[in-house]
Amino acid sequence: MGCTVREKHVKPTRRIKAAAFRSDPPLCWVEKIAMSQSIVENLVYHPGLTDSGSVNLNSVTENPEENFWAYCTEEHLEEILLKHLEFLYNQAVSKLLELGYEERVALKAVLSNGHCYGELDVLTNIVNNSLSYLNSGGGGGGSNGNGEDRTETGFTDLRDLEEYSLAGMIYLLQQVKPNLSKGDAMWCLLMSELHVGRASTLDVPTNRSSCCTKEDSNVEDVGTGGTLDIAGFMAPALCRFHGGWGFGNGGGPEFSGNGFSMKGAELKLQREIDCPKRFNLSPSMKSLLKRNVAAFAAGYRASMKQKQIQSSDTIGDSKACNDPAIVKSCGQQPRKSGSEESVSTVLEKFRDLNLDDNLESVGVDDKDCVIVDLLHQVKDFEKKVKERKEWAQKNAMQAAQKVSEELAELKTLSSEREGIQLLKKGKQAVEESTAKRFTDKEIELRKACSQNDRANVIVRKLENQNAEIRAEREGSKLSASESLKACMEASKKEKKCLKKLVAWEKQILKLQDEITAEKEKIKALYKTLAQITEYEKEIEAKWRQEQKAKEEALAQMEEEQRSKEAAEGHNKRKLETLRLKIELDFQRHKDDHQRLEQELGRLKASSDSDSSHISNNAWKPKKSQGENIAKLLEEIDKLEGSYDNEANYDRECIICMKDEVSVVFLPCAHQVVCGSCSDSFFASNNGGSKVTCPCCRGLVQQRIRIFGATS
């Protein structure tokens, strides 16, 4: 019970809580619980639920299965079951979608063969029947486990299928139990989670028709503070929790379809001994505290087992009581003595706890504050224990009163039975109905007795819890003393820290002097760095000027190169034009020369013929003959002059157009340049290698200089 002060502030109350799952529940369970909770919230304000029209949530949680569903009409039950079936069919379609089927195919399979009958739960049966339809190719009609066949077309929508499935299950249940009405059959299906086999084994309570009697079968669930226990509204399959609760591996609560039952007589709370880090306890102190608390827990557990054995004896005695006064005395007196003994046991165990008594004196104000805080918490706990005791006593009184009423009714029924037995044998039907009513009343009496026993068990549990709370109060006092010791140790540490702080301040002053010296050095370095940067800028400016001059020189060189290339191209084009002109003139002069030679030959022939004519024709006058000869001589002179001019033109250099040609190129044998132009021409064309003839563009392999009459 080593509860610290911090835990007391965080959790000021302790309540009996239902066991939790060891792992997160599946998603389908959570959705089912949410659906049932919404249904319950709609039914809480039903007019026929109570006589006064108001609903007590504590009474609702005490018996959820019978206090809610028993008051529902047939329409409400049918609506709830149809909603449940709709949820299950939607889950089945989603599972088929997860298996890789399309939504249309999955819905068709569910509508065609998605019956909810089979050996497993409803959802698994729907999925298996739909898968069998899909595996068979989707052809033919599917049949359920009860021999009801459907065609391949199936139903038009899920609503028709849900109504058909519900009607089929009600019909089967009424075939098994013919005395069931439709409402009772739907109630059995709701309690058995739509399982026809389990529904056929359920007994319909008598308050299904009257809606006035409450059977308290889940009294242990009342400590939840007015909240609805959703697990009670679900099927029994959803009410099985796993794991243990308490000290050790066992001893945990188990849930059944009727409610909440404990394996042991009391709730064993497992709490780890937590020593807060801010207390800074020594290892020896922690180990001593843990040993003391462990010893206290073991002793308290042993004493509680003894009280449990004694309480079981008192429960057996209370079952044997028939008088209400005897039942009341049997249920209350042992509880009072048991609570006092448990409290005394807790106090004795706390007296055995020992810690170091060598604690230094601390401030009275801090101690008073802690004690006042603890006293407030103790008062709160006492108020809560008192309220729970009053509630348990009230329930015990109600149960005892109910038992007395049932006993009186049992006596009247027994007298009626004796009177009926004296009647004739022709009234056998009346006798059978009376016997049935008598057995029902006996069952109700047993239930009332068991309800009273459970109320007694709850009272003892509350008393045990009260003892635990008192033990926790003593533990809080112990933790307060521990906190005082921790404060003393903290003050010592504070003194040590102050000494360290003074040493650190001296060291800080020394470091500040060093920092100022380093700052002066950094300033000097900054000055030198500025000078270096200025020098670097000057060098960079000079380098940029040189780079600019170099770029200008390169640009000028490129410009000269381009102009030189343009001049060479122009000269080559001009040379080519001259060569073509020379060739054309040469050809023209050659043709003229041939024509003139032919004309000269013709003239010579004509002169010979003329001389013969002159001799033959002496009578012609001499004047005409002399004129003809003069014309011929003039033409010959003109031809000779033009030939001389042409020959002189062919002897000029094609480059300088002044000097006479004096160089012959081989192998083309062209003579088109003078000696000086030949040297410059060869020098400008790669130093004389691969020189082409300016006349025919042939490669010149050799040049020969010639000398004529004018050279």
Curated annotation (Swiss-Prot):
A zinc finger (RING-type) spans 653-697. Residues 552-571, 602-622 are annotated as: Disordered. It comes from the Eukaryota. GO terms for molecular function: zinc ion binding. Residues 602-611 have a biased composition (Basic and acidic residues). InterPro entries: PIR2-like (IPR046934), PIR2-like_helical (IPR046527), Znf_RING (IPR001841), Znf_RING/FYVE/PHD (IPR013083). Residues 390-648 form a coiled coil. The keyword Transport does not apply. CDD domains: RING-HC_MIP1-like. Keywords: Coiled coil, Metal-binding, Zinc, Zinc-finger. Interacts (via C-terminal domain) with MND1 and HOP2. Interacts with XRI1 (via C-terminal domain). PANTHER family: MND1-INTERACTING PROTEIN 1, OS05G0141500 PROTEIN. This is MND1-interacting protein 1. It comes from Arabidopsis thaliana. The lineage of its organism: Eukaryota, Viridiplantae, Streptophyta, Embryophyta, Tracheophyta.
